[in-house]
């Protein structure tokens, strides 16, 4: 084949790949907005609708009802470009989550004993239940995976709380500044901090193949990275922000470039350490969480693009890995029901018990339990890490996705019932519910 022919073939391949990527992106963005709008219309979070739409675009529905069309859209081109886009979006989203993290909740003195008890019970009980479930169920539902590693990721998925979406649900019910709201958001903040640290440690442990030496080295490198980020990178970034920030709370092009470069370099650093690049994005957000003008400017200029473009890509990426049809036996659905029951009992029951122990009423304790049970996007991030590591099977992945959806869907109806009983929270009218996204600004 001549050089000209090779060049022509290369151009044709590139154009063909671009065609299918653009087709996928058009479908994902449009249907993501439709799914989100439907969810908002019925009084749910926009994130719930986008997650469900992502699953419906995968083999669970689209692939089952129209396999030829599904393969044409999603299997005609190599999956790597869409995978890379989803991971870039996830890194940016993790940066955004880090930016929005409010550490002042961790120092709130009001009802401190209740906060500590609720956070502890809401983390420890579901983690232990998830660990037991994952360990004993692994031979049946993840036979090819490392049994202990699989159990650790299931336990982490059960113990996490979706702080950003929980905060927005609380805003809809106007309870963020009430004593109950302060207790919940503070407990969820502690839960989230420990949850992300736990995920980083478990990821490092799994990648070290449970070698004490390799694991210790990864932890040492991770600690050095965190220290260098806080004591060296943060002061440098603050100087650059002071020099490059725009007028008011605007984000100049130069500062935007610096932030994006810092996010990607941080992701590269955590990858080189031996944990996933998404942790680098989160760490960079945490470094700048107190730069309020930067946070506002980022959310206004870039946050909405991440929400509208990248987030549905990640949900669809998750949906393509989810196959509800793979749960093709009563035994598998039985395991799924048990997982959902343990997840709800562990988080709701643990937080309810801790709240009652702290002297709160039954109604207050129920509201705390249902709010702390919200998982949404945070759990999807955890289980995607576990799936990429090969420590959970597709069936377990599907079960955990369903659990993430159910645990989030039941939050708003539960609050509509229990908050009025304790004289709090005007349930939002369905037609006026503000769209909310996990880790992203309302759009």
List each model region and its residues.
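Membrane-interface segments at loop-to-transmembrane junctions
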Residues: 41-44, 78, 109-121, 178-190, ...
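Structural signature of hydrophobic alpha-helical transmembrane segments
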Residues: 12-27, 78-95, 145-161, 218-228, ...
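Transmembrane alpha-helical segments of multi-pass membrane transport proteins and ion-pumping complexes
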Residues: 25-37, 55, 59, 63-64, ...
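Small-residue-rich segments of transmembrane alpha-helices in multi-pass membrane proteins
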Residues: 50-62, 117-131, 153, 186-200, ...
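Short, strongly hydrophobic alpha-helical membrane anchors
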Residues: 1-17
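Flexible hinge motifs at transmembrane-helix junctions and intramembrane kinks/re-entrant loops
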Residues: 34-49, 55, 265-280, 403-404
């Amino acid at each position: 084949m001549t050089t000209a022919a090779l060049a022509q073939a290369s151009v044709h391949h590139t154009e063909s790949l671009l065609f299918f990527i653009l087709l996928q992106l058009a479908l994902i963005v449009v249907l993501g907005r439709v799914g989100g709008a439907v969810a908002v219309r019925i009084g749910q979070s926009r994130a719930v609708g986008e997650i469900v739409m992502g699953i419906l675009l995968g083999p669970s529905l689209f692939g089952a009802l129209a396999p030829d069309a599904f393969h044409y859209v999603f299997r005609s081109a190599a999956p790597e470009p869409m995978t890379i886009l989803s991971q870039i979006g996830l890194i940016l989203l993790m940066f955004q989550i880090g930016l929005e993290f409010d550490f002042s909740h961790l120092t709130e003195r009001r009802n401190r004993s209740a906060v500590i008890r609720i956070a502890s019970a809401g983390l420890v009980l579901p983690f232990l239940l998830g660990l037991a479930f994952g360990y004993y169920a692994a031979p049946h539902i993840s036979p090819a995976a490392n049994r202990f590693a699989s159990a650790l990721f299931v336990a982490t998925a059960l113990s996490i709380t979706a702080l950003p979406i929980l905060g927005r649900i609380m805003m809809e019910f106007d309870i963020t500044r009430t004593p109950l709201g302060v207790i919940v958001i503070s407990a969820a903040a502690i839960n989230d901090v420990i949850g992300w640290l736990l995920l980083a440690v478990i990821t490092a442990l799994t990648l070290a193949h449970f070698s004490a030496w390799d694991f210790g080295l990864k932890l040492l490198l991770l600690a050095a990275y965190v220290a260098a980020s806080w004591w060296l990178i943060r002061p440098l970034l603050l100087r650059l922000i002071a020099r490059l920030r725009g007028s008011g709370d605007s984000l100049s092009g130069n500062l935007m470039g610096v932030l994006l470069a810092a996010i990607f370099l941080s992701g590269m650093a955590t990858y080189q350490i031996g944990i996933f690049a998404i942790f680098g994005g989160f760490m960079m957000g945490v470094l700048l969480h107190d730069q309020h003008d930067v946070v506002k400017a980022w959310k206004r200029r870039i946050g909405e693009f991440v929400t509208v473009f990248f987030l549905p890509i990640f949900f669809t990426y998750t949906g393509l890995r989810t196959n509800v049809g793979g749960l093709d036996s009563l035994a598998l659905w039985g395991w799924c029901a048990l997982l959902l029951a343990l997840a709800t009992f562990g988080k709701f029951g643990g937080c309810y018990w801790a709240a009652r122990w702290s002297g709160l009423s039954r109604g207050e304790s129920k509201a705390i339990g249902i709010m702390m049970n919200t998982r949404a996007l945070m759990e999807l991030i955890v289980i995607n890490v576990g799936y990429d590591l090969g420590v959970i099977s597709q069936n377990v992945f599907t079960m955990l996705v369903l659990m993430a959806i159910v645990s989030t869907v039941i939050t708003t109806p539960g609050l509509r019932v229990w908050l009025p009983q304790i004289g709090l929270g005007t349930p939002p009218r369905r037609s006026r519910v503000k769209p909310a996204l996990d880790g992203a600004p309302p759009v």
